[in-house]
């Protein structure tokens, strides 16, 4: 594929993603917290710090992998980097493959580090990238961690996508052993099963982003790019973020589980943390905010989001993310059925 074609595809992804709406029905609504009437904590007591295995996040929120690889997406990445810098949240870039193939595209990613020299930044490659290119991707951004995205459904619906996946697990193992920063294996909106998480744990992966169904839908995005748009029936493929977090329960002591996919509100984010996530990522909400309303309004949105998380934690009478993981929740019959049929040990 030519560089112009790749740049066009990057722009198409952003345009279609921005046009997608939030899910009207979400598994986050299948969870209820138990309200206790008299909190013993004040809002100012709430500590949103999240301690991961290799670094500390001042806020349990991050701008998740989105874009890069074109002039337009360079501008988007620069604006998002300002948001990350000013609010102190972490940020991931989209797949750096374009920059690894063509050095002219490198600035569309490195602009993030240039804009936010002291922030926590995740670089991003695919599961099929050669190990030396994974190392190069980390250097490109002086990244604190490397996301490796696994996106088989997207590739299979993408007209020009990959059709070979049997080497992915072995390649992931090699990347983990060679890269000198933490490796985050990240889904792209299809969720993860306990079997996948177990396999990743066995090859030394200590971070996964379960990235469940409910947010940006890459089956729908790639189907829009197909001549006959003939694979729309796969639009609900995969596990939701809630189902994926439940699937991860047995591995939350050994691994840091990150949650993303369809997080709409601060309440959704708090539910992710209560289900065992160490941090919560969002992509499209930040993209839509910064492109439609600008940097100042996006800063206000981000600060309001974390402030509301503190208020919810106050109502739950918990001071820390660690305390939140012990809070009481009630699951709907739908989620309880998933837990029972999948044989999940969630407490």
UniProtKB/Swiss-Prot annotation:
Substrate binds at residues 9-10, 95-97, 154. InterPro entries: Aldolase_TIM (IPR013785), FMN-dep_DH (IPR000262), IPdP_isomerase (IPR011179). Its main location: cytoplasm. Transmembrane segments: none annotated. GO terms for biological process: isoprenoid biosynthetic process. Keywords: Cytoplasm, Flavoprotein, FMN, Isomerase, Isoprene biosynthesis, Magnesium, Metal-binding, NADP. GO terms for molecular function: FMN binding; isopentenyl-diphosphate delta-isomerase activity; magnesium ion binding; NADPH binding; oxidoreductase activity. Its EC number is 5.3.3.2. CDD domains: IDI-2_FMN. Mg(2+) binds at residue 155. It catalyses: isopentenyl diphosphate = dimethylallyl diphosphate. It is an enzyme of class 5 (isomerase). Pfam families: FMN_dh. It is found in: Cytoplasm. FMN binds at residues 65-67, 95, 124, 186, 211, 216, 262-264, 283-284. GO terms for cellular component: cytoplasm. Its cofactor is FMN; NADPH; Mg(2+). Homooctamer. Dimer of tetramers. Belongs to the IPP isomerase type 2 family. Involved in the biosynthesis of isoprenoids. Catalyzes the 1,3-allylic rearrangement of the homoallylic substrate isopentenyl (IPP) to its allylic isomer, dimethylallyl diphosphate (DMAPP). This is Isopentenyl-diphosphate delta-isomerase. It comes from Staphylococcus saprophyticus subsp. saprophyticus (strain ATCC 15305 / DSM 20229 / NCIMB 8711 / NCTC 7292 / S-41). The gene is fni.
């Amino acid at each position: 594929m030519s560089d112009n074609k790749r740049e066009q595809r990057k722009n198409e992804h952003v345009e279609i993603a921005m046009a997608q709406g939030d899910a009207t029905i979400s598994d986050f609504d299948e969870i209820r917290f138990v309200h206790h009437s008299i909190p013993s904590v004040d809002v100012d007591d709430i500590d949103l710090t999240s301690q991961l295995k290799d670094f500390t996040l001042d806020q349990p929120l991050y701008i998740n992998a989105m874009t890069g690889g074109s002039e337009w997406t360079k501008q988007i990445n620069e604006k998002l980097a300002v948001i990350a810098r000013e609010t102190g949240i972490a940020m991931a870039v989209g797949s750096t493959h374009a920059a690894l193939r063509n050095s002219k595209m490198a600035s569309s990613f490195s602009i993030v580090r240039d804009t936010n020299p002291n922030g926590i930044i995740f670089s991003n490659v695919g599961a099929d990238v050669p190990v030396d290119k994974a190392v190069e991707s980390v250097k490109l951004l002086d990244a604190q961690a490397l996301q490796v995205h696994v996106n088989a459904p997207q590739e299979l619906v993408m007209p020009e996508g990959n059709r070979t996946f049997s080497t992915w697990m072995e390649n992931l193992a090699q990347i983990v052993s060679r890269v000198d920063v933490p490796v985050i294996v990240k889904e792209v909106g299809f969720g993860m099963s306990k079997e996948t998480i177990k396999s990743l744990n066995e090859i030394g992966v200590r971070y996964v982003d379960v990235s469940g169904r409910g947010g940006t839908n890459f089956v729908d995005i790639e189907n829009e790019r197909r001549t006959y748009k003939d694979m729309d029936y796969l639009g609900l493929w995969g596990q939701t973020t809630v189902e994926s977090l439940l699937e991860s329960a047995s591995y939350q002591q050994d691994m840091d589980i990150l949650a993303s996919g369809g997080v709409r509100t601060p309440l959704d984010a708090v539910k992710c943390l209560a289900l065992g996530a160490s941090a919560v990522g969002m992509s499209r909400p930040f993209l839509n905010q910064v492109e439609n309303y600008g940097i100042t309004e996006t800063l206000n949105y981000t600060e309001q989001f974390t402030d509301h998380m503190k208020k919810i934690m106050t109502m739950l009478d918990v001071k820390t993310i660690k305390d939140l993981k012990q809070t009481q929740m009630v699951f709907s019959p739908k989620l309880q059925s998933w837990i029972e049929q999948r044989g999940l040990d969630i407490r």
